[in-house]
Amino acid sequence: MIVALIEKVYSFLWGDLIHIPLPGGGSVGISLLIILLIPTGIYFTVRTRLLPIRMFPDMIKALTGKKENKDSLSTFQTLIVSTATRVGMGNLVGVVAAISVGGAGAVFWMWITAIIGSSTAFVEATLAQLHKEPDPLYSGYRGGPAYYIHHYFEDKSGKKKKHVIIAVLFAISGLICWCGISQVISNSVTSSFENAFGVPTIYTTIILVAVAAVIVLRKNATVKVLDIVVPIMAVCYFVITIFIIIKNIGMMPSVFSRIFEEAFGIRQVAAGGFGAVLMNGVKRGLFSNEAGSGSAPCAAAAAECDTPVKAGLTQALGVFIDTIVICSCTAMIMLTAPENIVAGKEGMDLLQSAMRYHLGDFGVIFIAVTLFLFSFSTFLGILFYARSNVAYLFGDNWISQTMYKVLALVMLFVGGIAAYTFVWDLGDVGIGLMTIFNTGILYLMGGQAIKELRVFEESNKAQSNSQCSQQGDNVTQ
């Protein structure tokens, strides 16, 4: 009964809700989440006046802010946490799947969704900063969609409330989602290590859970570990990709030509394949960078910064790093490998075959280790997100915090030794419901973030004019 219900909800959220016919007899199937996320991204890209493009330098500057409270997080540290959860298995296997089904053109649409997704990420992160509150358990600050949803309905009613039903549903959806993801993470890691090194899954699982337990059961060890692991894993993957690109530099014109030709190609439209190109790129871009799902705001709220806009700009940059940089790295690895090398393969096997072609056996080992680091950091990141949602539901007590961590560790163990698709579907349902609750409230509250952006821009303009005036006075003297 419950399994059947979950399957129906999963199909409603992730299945093709509508079909748009295309020339050549094909059609584009669009899911409910795509219907929600794409218009939301476009809407806020217009409202912010192309923020991801015109304010990219400000995104970089936002990382340099210093914190006064040693227990709080800097904007850079919150970027590390959100990048840890964004950059995961989807950046490897997900991109491979998108290209396998949608072709090289899917990469272009992945880039487009990153641009509009950055605008959504800015708005939700700025709102999280505006509605954050002190964290008496971990010190610093906490917040996220559950908190700004709560404040919205509390302000509307004019009465103090302990809980708001929509905020409660969001928090529960998040906790369900992150437990499901824990299973996917461990299953991917153990399978990868078994294929690459022949290590039995039970051994990898025990080590994975033991290391995770040592970190997550300590009060503030998660961020300290991520501060080290995330930059190393991202830089190593980027450097290896640059090496592969340089090694195959002669192929780059044809690779980019394929990306753009297949993104708009008449041949794809005529063959009815344009829908696959478009939707696979869009899906991979949206669900890799998490913009709109409400996950990253849980990290953004923890930042200590002099204006909420800086937290928003930081998370917009996170979308760029995830999709434009890391996902593109995987795409370049795939598109520079000969078709006969990867033919007939899928998923992780396909990516490992491409890496074996480029770097020999080292490539296979490197991908296995990279998947471990990407996935492990994702697990640590989602438990950081869970803190604020557990606190919203159960109050400020260590019992509930510890119980959820133990539950996540159990799911990590179970996922390492067996694959339960029901639990995976439950996790996907969780993130789908999170997205529905979050995008709905963004339309109602997004004006607050836009107002903060206008104030920020006016302040920067006034500061710039003041500096120019001072320089003019100095020249006159």
Model regions: which residues?
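Alpha-helical membrane segments and immediately flanking helix-loop junctions
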Residues: N69-V101, L127-L130, L137-F153, L169-I172, ...
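Transmembrane helix-loop junctions in multi-pass membrane proteins
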Residues: R47-P52, N91-V95, C177-T190, A213-V225, ...
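Selective recognition of specific alpha-helical transmembrane segments in multi-pass small-molecule
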Residues: I116-E124, T204-K219, V230-G250, K283-L286, ...
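Membrane-interface loop-to-helix entry segments
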Residues: L36, F44-I60, I166, N187-F193, ...
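Helix-loop-helix module between adjacent transmembrane segments
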Residues: T40-T45, I116-Y141, H150-I215, V369-L380, ...
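Flexible loop linkers connecting adjacent transmembrane helices
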Residues: L50-T75, A97, G103-A106, S119-K161, ...
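Extracellular/periplasmic helix-exit of transmembrane alpha-helices
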Residues: E124-P136, I242-R258, G272, A302-C305, ...
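N-terminal alpha-helical transmembrane segments of multi-pass membrane transport
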Residues: M1-M89, I99-A106, G117, Y443-Q477
